[in-house]
Amino acid sequence: MVFSFSVSAGILKGKITDRSGESLPFATVYVHGTTMGTSANAMGEYQLQLPAGTYKIACQYIGYRQSSLSLTIGADETVQYNFQLEDQGLQMKEHVVKASEDPAMYIMRKVIGRRKFHKDQIEAFQTGIYMKALLKTRQTPDKVLGQKVNKEEAGLDSAGKGILLLIEQIATYYRQGGKERTVIHSVRESGDPNGMGVPKFPDVISFYENNIHISSQLNPRGFVSPLNDFAFNFYKFRLEGDFKEGNHTIYKINVMPKRLYEPVFSGNIYVVDEDWSLHSLDLTVTKKSNMELIDTLRIEQVYLPLQRDLWVIKQQVLYPTIKIFGFDFTGSFVTIYNDQKVNEPAPDSIFNEKVISEYDAGANKKDTTYWSAARPVPLLEEEAKDFQDKDSLRQRFERPEYIDSVRRRFNRPKVSSLIIGGYTYRGKDDKFLLRTNALLTGLANYNTIEGLNIAPKFSLAWSLDSANSITGTAALRYGFENGHFNAIGRINYVHSDREWRTKYWSAGVEAGKYVFQFNPNNPLDALYNTISTLFYRRNYLKLYERWNGYLHFTKNHGNGFRWSAKLGFQQRLPLQNSTDFSFAREDMGGFTENMPPEFKGYSWEKHNAVTAGISISYQPGFTYVKYPDYLQPYSSKLPTFTLAYEKGIPSVLDSKVDFDKWRFSVRDNISLKLLGNLAYHLSTGGFLNTSQVNIPDLNHINGNQLTLASPYLESFQVAPYYTYSNQSGLYGEAHLEWQLKGFLTNKIPLLRQLRWYLVTGGNVYYVDQNLYHTEAFVGIDNVGYEKFRVFRIDLVQSWNSMNLPVTAIRIGLSPTSIIRLNLGDRSGEW
């Protein structure tokens, strides 16, 4: 099943060119009548191991006439043979078609009519796989965003050219009845002797599917297959001609988009007459196909006949090109399939519904002798050199003195660290890590309670060994107007399971005094409030001081199930405004008191509160990759369910709270394929007991009264911060967002050139007919230039129980952007 090798096998090797001597990269060489074969490398060089015997060898390349060779080869014999392929001579077979249409239309109707048959005919599939991933740079800038690019460390030459990624793997793949399993036998990663490559190979891109999903990062809508049931709505087809290959007539059909900016392919497909199946294809998607992240992706596939009416994949090559930040990348991802078996049941022991990929022990420890014999595709000279050079570079980079020099260089403070991102300090051997915040993430703020305040925050991670660590966070804060100094800290002991990644437990303690918003979800970011206070005279931020003493425990089971518990003491202290300074004119409005007017009915004074809480979340459907030494969870596509309960405990330590509060939520992001994505966050909850409830304990919604958007699917864009706070026994909350991802806008001339996407949806909070808030919005996402498409602009309309409808514009950072910007700090209560 795998790409095996034998000391008694003969070797057929050579080069594949066209008539002019030009190399034919990744041409296919195989034993006629079987699926045993190989592929040439990028220079057309091939090598095929054969047991002693007599064979008919076929060589083919898309767009060229197949060539064959008959030979007898002995054990340990090497035969040199160079294939020279001629252009495919095409002829036009007569077809009974409408006078007004291209003959390709008749052929494509036949192919589309058999699409589902070919999609479903393979119920069980087994194959050996060889994959080689190569990513090179043709151009590298000297600096990116002000940071120098170290070309030497990346293994590039002085011109910035070279190989960035080189991986080869050999595996066996099984699929049966909706289950799949990949067993990786060997892997080699240039520059990393411990590298494990990729646990899941690039999938066979089945053009028999209506919608081709390659990657959510490329296009979450997927692409329309030329064999789609409604392909004629998206494509034009032109018959280029036909040719004979053995007993088969093969049609070459040119595939063309009907309209620009549709998620479609262009290129050529080759179709087998009467079988109406794919013979091979050469298709491309570009930016004009609504593709993100990369600039072009070319896909080549070659199929071989396994039996009558059944053609199976032999080879798939992906050619991406990417231009970003001055880099120019190109690559090839070659996957060769060998010894395919169709509809032969695999043993039940092969499949484990949870483990989808598994590595053999020592998979990444194979020596060069193994790879020289096992690899079916000869390495290029530059690839062989890259393996050697990267090994030499690695040995140099692993020297203690070099590692220490890199660490010292990394630890040098930079001006940019003060402004955005914060400063990071790495200790020796990376056992200690310290991070700070920056100006744009909360280091300095302004509000009417404290005036100018300095609030440095520190987070640390100290690795004790491979399974145990200590993490901590500390924050200091000084308000220059009210003169209050606050300090708080949290420290955790974390134990991780060495054999099951993401499986851990954590226990910790928190203590100190700090300032907090009345809504513990921190709906208003301090940076945004600074802007609104200083320039618009809007002091939306309302704070109180609190002494904290908490015990925390969290356990993640590594299978989608996670729970946490906490028990703590609070002493809550009221605060008042201490300044009314603003750059804005006084006629723009006056500042409001620190106590929100909605809470005038509450007795807000110094008091103690003892609370306990537990939270449980579960996301079913986790699968796993089994590495030689550990298990790695693989993300699930199913919803996440969360249940939380909080208890206010009266009398203990003079606690003045007595309540029981719960909340249940479910959230998910569903692919609607060509229609985009549908994301939702639904929740319900309320109080079971309201004997003593104070302001921070209420049911709060995350409101927003700024032009800057608050987090999507978490908040209400035009709701006041505290108008809907309540202690009701039951409420319902829903956030729904349809991200069209180019659907509809790709038909509007200006918008499709700008690659702006529509987004629409709504937010609802409902207690009863006297207390509710509803929002509907429509917006433009993906706003920006080139790769910097980070903005989103919404028009929001609200209806509410106060009979005060609001229409407003909200400008935010797109949550679906490839490039993420993080401004402000919403990392926790403090």
Task: Give, region by region, the residue ranges found by the protein language model.
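A short, solvent-exposed loop/turn motif at the edges and junctions
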Residues: 31-32, 58-70
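Structured extracytoplasmic
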Residues: 96-250, 256-264, 325-438, 442-445, ...
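Transmembrane beta-strand segments that form the barrel wall of outer-membrane beta-barrel proteins
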Residues: 97, 282-287, 433-446, 457, ...
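Short loop/turn motifs that connect adjacent beta-strands in outer-membrane beta-barrel proteins
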Residues: 119-121, 413-416, 425-435, 448, ...
